[in-house]
UniProtKB/Swiss-Prot annotation:
GO biological process: defense response to bacterium; hemolysis in another organism; monoatomic ion transport
Family of the protein in this entry: Belongs to the non-disulfide-bridged peptide (NDBP) superfamily. Long chain multifunctional peptide (group 2) family.
Coiled coil: none
Family annotation (InterPro entries): Antimicrobial_7 (IPR012526)
Organism for this UniProt entry: Pandinus imperator (Emperor scorpion)
Cellular location(s): Secreted; Target cell membrane
Name of the protein described by the UniProt record: Pandinin-1
Amino acid sequence: GKVWDWIKSAAKKIWSSEPVSQLKGQVLNAAKNYVAEKIGATPT
């Protein structure tokens, strides 16, 4: 329905907004570093 369409488009806007993009990048980097530490490798 209409409400669902609105929710989806709002979620898409939020998901691709700048603060969220930066946050996603930080989380990805943290995860990569964590895994690298666990397996004893340096992230590239």
